[in-house]
């Protein structure tokens, strides 16, 4: 480890010890392109990183970590909607605050999601009944080899549950430089999850929802500035109606959410909790005491500690429910991202 130059501990919210050959902060498209070509000339891999809130470094990275810090928020409006053009390096929660302060509701359910705006389309971030795909108008994508920018429409992004085209076709060699957000003026509240279900849809305001979401998240999720974590570690599994019916029959209180295609989304945190794993620890990594979906850096954890813990959790849930959880967090090895499911199998 010591022969590599740049520590990544402060650049990942898990606060795991890892190193890279080099770290470059890029505040412009030109810097992104120059750093990309310099690394290619050296035959070094490049990792594009936002705020490091959804990554797990399982090894030292052998190349350059490129921090996307392209900033700026501009807005226009027409009779139907507000249109925001947002730099990829902007903090997501600050964008939510900015929109509400300027009386543009629509992002309030997505408050306090960690990370930057450029990472939001990659994961199709979502919380409390709202996903990015519902408000995304376009994504401006840089081809770092060619030096060209193309605008990808929301439809072309192929958004799925914590998935998009940016994890596949537009992965390596591409960088999101800005995101277009469309907020409809005919705002209606989304109140189907958590404490929001107790709110009156006729009188509730976007600020009410924002405050409630912030309260819920702060009560359940550890602050990464205090306790290293990457938020929800696993995706909520989507299963067939038949499997869900079987589980609900055995566990009537099991949280379950019918999807438009007839499948059912289950709560991964609840599944883990049923295995009595809150507080369970391997090495320096542990399951959070309040929210079983969150794995934490309890005490100088390493990436391998987290791997061992995640693997054990998957095995326990599969043994009890015959459901294999998939990580939401991206696994980063020496040459870049690796398949998280394969790594845990």
UniProtKB/Swiss-Prot annotation:
Coiled-coil residue windows: none
Q: Which pathway is it part of?
A: Cell wall biogenesis; peptidoglycan biosynthesis
Q: What is its main location?
A: cytoplasm
Instruction: Give the GO cellular component terms, alphabetically.
Output: cytosol
Provide a Gene Ontology MF annotation, just one.
UDP-N-acetylmuramate dehydrogenase activity
The record's keywords, sorted A to Z, are:
Cell cycle, Cell division, Cell shape, Cell wall biogenesis/degradation, Cytoplasm, FAD, Flavoprotein, NADP, Oxidoreductase, Peptidoglycan synthesis
Which residues does UniProt mark as catalytic? 162, 232 (proton donor), 328
Q: Which Pfam families match?
A: FAD_binding_4 (PF01565), MurB_C (PF02873)
- What biological process terms from GO does the record include? cell division; cell wall organization; peptidoglycan biosynthetic process; regulation of cell shape
InterPro entries in the record, alphabetically?
A: FAD-bd_PCMH (IPR016166), FAD-bd_PCMH-like_sf (IPR036318), FAD-bd_PCMH_sub1 (IPR016167), FAD-bd_PCMH_sub2 (IPR016169), MurB (IPR003170), MurB_C (IPR011601), MurB_C_sf (IPR036635), Oxid_FAD_bind_N (IPR006094)
Residue ranges occupied by any FAD-binding PCMH-type domain in the UniProt entry: 16-186
Q: What does it catalyze?
A: UDP-N-acetyl-alpha-D-muramate + NADP(+) = UDP-N-acetyl-3-O-(1-carboxyvinyl)-alpha-D-glucosamine + NADPH + H(+)
Needed co-factor(s): FAD
Q: Where in the cell is it found?
A: Cytoplasm
Q: What class of enzyme is it?
A: oxidoreductase
Catalytic activity, EC: 1.3.1.98
Q: What does this protein do?
A: Cell wall formation.
Instruction: Spell out the family assignment given in the record's similarity comment.
Output: Belongs to the MurB family.
The entry's protein name is UDP-N-acetylenolpyruvoylglucosamine reductase
Q: Give the originating organism.
A: Yersinia pseudotuberculosis serotype I (strain IP32953)
């Amino acid at each position: 480890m010591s022969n590599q130059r740049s520590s990544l501990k402060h650049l990942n919210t898990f606060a795991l010890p890892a190193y890279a050959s080099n770290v470059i902060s890029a505040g412009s498209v030109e810097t992104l392109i120059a750093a990309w070509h310099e690394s290619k000339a050296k035959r070094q891999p490049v990792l594009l990183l936002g705020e490091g809130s959804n990554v797990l470094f399982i090894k030292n990275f052998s190349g350059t970590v490129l921090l996307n810090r392209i900033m700026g928020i501009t807005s226009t409006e027409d009779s139907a909607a507000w249109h925001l053009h947002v730099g990829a390096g902007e903090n997501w929660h600050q964008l939510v605050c900015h929109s509400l302060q300027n009386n543009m509701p629509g992002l309030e359910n997505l408050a306090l999601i960690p990370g930057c705006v450029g990472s939001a389309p990659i994961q199709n971030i979502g919380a409390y009944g709202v996903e990015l795909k519902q408000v995304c108008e376009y994504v401006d994508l840089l081809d770092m080899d060619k030096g060209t920018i193309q605008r990808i429409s929301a439809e072309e992004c192929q958004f799925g549950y914590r998935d998009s085209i940016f994890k596949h076709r537009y992965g390596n060699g591409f960088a999101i430089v800005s995101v277009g957000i469309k907020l409809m003026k005919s705002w209606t509240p989304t109140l189907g999850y958590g404490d929001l279900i107790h709110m009156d849809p006729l009188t509730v305001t976007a600020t009410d929802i924002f405050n409630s979401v912030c309260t819920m998240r702060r009560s359940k999720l550890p602050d990464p500035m205090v306790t290293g974590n990457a938020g929800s570690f696993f995706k909520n599994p989507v299963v067939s109606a038949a499997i869900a019916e079987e589980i609900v029959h055995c566990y009537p209180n099991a949280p379950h959410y019918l999807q438009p295609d007839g499948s059912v989304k289950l709560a991964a945190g609840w599944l883990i909790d049923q295995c009595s794993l809150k507080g369970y620890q391997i090495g320096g990594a542990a399951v959070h005491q309040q929210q079983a979906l969150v794995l934490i850096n309890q005490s100088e954890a390493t990436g391998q500690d987290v791997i061992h813990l995640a693997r054990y959790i998957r095995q326990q849930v599969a043994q009890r429910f015959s459901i294999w959880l998939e990580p939401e967090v991206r696994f980063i090895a020496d040459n870049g991202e690796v398949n998280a499911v394969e790594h845990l199998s």
